[in-house]
């Protein structure tokens, strides 16, 4: 119990510190995710991915906030960190003052900047919309910091509790489970993912809880476990479109075991909860996910056609490197030697795991982990191309 309380305290301290120390808009695509939250909080309804724009408040803040060179390639009008820190203290202080004094009424006025994150499912943004509305009278930097803290605290606690349950299913005893959780909470990429405004803070813990629910369904099939798994997956589908890749696993568990009642229950729940959002995408954009790539014609047949031409060793290494350490929108990373050492250690652990005996829960976790790695690469490519295109 003492170790668990220390882990919770460690998570809360990291959540708050990372949220307040991260520069404004340094989180992955953060101003665009925030604009989604702001549109919902202002009662303007769900955004249209083809026409949604940032508010003038957010647009003005982007011009007053320093950004990385990677962001400057996409938005040449922003000030780079190098330029910003070459200014005298008085000029930097004036820029911060102007940032704090941006009129809050500009939140109601659209800017010229398109919101390329408007295609995302709405659940995570809806949960942040109420706090954003309650904090509307505060300056933009304060609101962003508070929303980050809310997201990071909620996401880390959900992830911690879900990971504990998953470790229990995998029969990982203490102190190994505690050490693994400590390593997880010490991972920079975890906080880069959770401690910024977006939908990742909810998607990551939901993925873990979905695995927990799928393991329960696999071990103890029944109507209740099927309903819980379907609700967890529906929540994921309303947070990130990549949860579509988990649907075959849920359906497969029911079909392989010929649990037709459970299949009917899961189908009704998924269609009833997540179906309207994806039906909206089909009606509006003609594609299921609504993403920029899908709307541009990059579908599954296209991906399969070009797959043989991909340099897969480079893709795998890039995926590993991105997942180990990516310094937010600055895209900084560790040295190659450090990453090689971490990768070699992880590979050795994986080989030891392969050589051991496995329960069903472990194999379902492995399947979803492999799928998640592929989708993580896809996601990383999206936020790289979005800022640099």
Report each predicted region and the residues it spans.
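Transmembrane-helix motifs of polytopic, lipid-linked glycan transferases
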Residues: 145-171, 209
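Membrane-interface transmembrane helices that cradle and orient dolichyl/undecaprenyl
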Residues: 168-171, 210-228
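Perimembrane helix-loop-helix junctions
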Residues: 216-219, 245-271, 278
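Membrane-interface alpha helices of multi-pass inner-membrane proteins
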Residues: 225-241, 246-252
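Membrane-lumen/periplasm interface segments of multi-pass, membrane-embedded glycan/lipid transferases
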Residues: 282-359
